[in-house]
Amino acid sequence: MTSPMQRTRVKICGLTREEDIDAAVAAGADALGFVLWPGSSRAIDEARLARLAARVPAFVTRVGLFVDQADDEIRRYARHLDLVQLHGNESPDDCARLDTPWIKALRMRDGIDLHAEMSRYDAARGLLLDAYRPGVPGGTGETFDWSRIPANLAKPVILAGGLTADNVAEAIHRVRPYAVDVSGGVEAAKGLKDPARIRAFLSQVSHTQAP
C-alpha cells in the first residue's frame, strides 16, 4: 500500500505499437506492459517485443504478462523485460524458478484470502489485484469491490480492473494502492491506445493524493 506521502505509480498495459510507447512515456507512465500470452487479442510475438522494448527509455519498467506458460518460453521473452507478471495459476514454486523479478496477479474470486496469498507468494515484488470472471485470466474491463482489499497488506498492491480516467481518483482514495494498471481504459480500440485517454488518466493520477 502507499502512504499519504507517496505518489501512485502507473502501468499502461497491452502495448502493441511504437507510437503507443511514445505516448505512454511522454505522459509519465512508470511501467509499460506487454501481453505475451497468445490467448489475448493484445498479444505480441518476441520480434515485436524486442522492437518495442528497445524503444523504452531508462527508468521506465518493461513488464511482460504471462499465463501458465513454460519456464523456457518466459525466460526467452524475459531477455527484453525488467519484470514478469504472472497472471495464471502459477504456484509459488513455478514463480520461484524464474530468474527475473516477478509480480503475481490475483483475480478477486469470492472467498479469496489476500493475507494468505501474500504469504504464499512471499517472494513476489508485489500483488496485482484484478476482477474475477470464470475462464478469463484478465483484461475483463470490469471493476470489483475495492472494499475487499485489506488496508494492512504488507506487499505493494497494484490495482487493476476496469480503471479509467473517470474512476481512478476514487480508486486511489479508497484503496491507496502502490500502483494502478490500465489497458482498455486508455484505448481507442482493442490493442490501440489513445494518447488523449492516456494523458487524461495520468493527469487524474498525478492530481490525486491518497487520504
UniProtKB/Swiss-Prot annotation:
Gene transcribed to yield this protein: trpF
Enzyme Commission number: 5.3.1.24
Family per similarity comment: Belongs to the TrpF family.
Key words, A-Z: Amino-acid biosynthesis, Aromatic amino acid biosynthesis, Isomerase, Tryptophan biosynthesis
Reaction it catalyzes: N-(5-phospho-beta-D-ribosyl)anthranilate = 1-(2-carboxyphenylamino)-1-deoxy-D-ribulose 5-phosphate
GO terms for biological process, alphabetical: L-tryptophan biosynthetic process
Record-linked Gene3D superfamilies: Aldolase class I (3.20.20.70)
CDD domains: PRAI (cd00405)
Involved pathway(s): Amino-acid biosynthesis; L-tryptophan biosynthesis; L-tryptophan from chorismate: step 3/5
Family annotation (Pfam families): PRAI
Protein name: N-(5'-phosphoribosyl)anthranilate isomerase
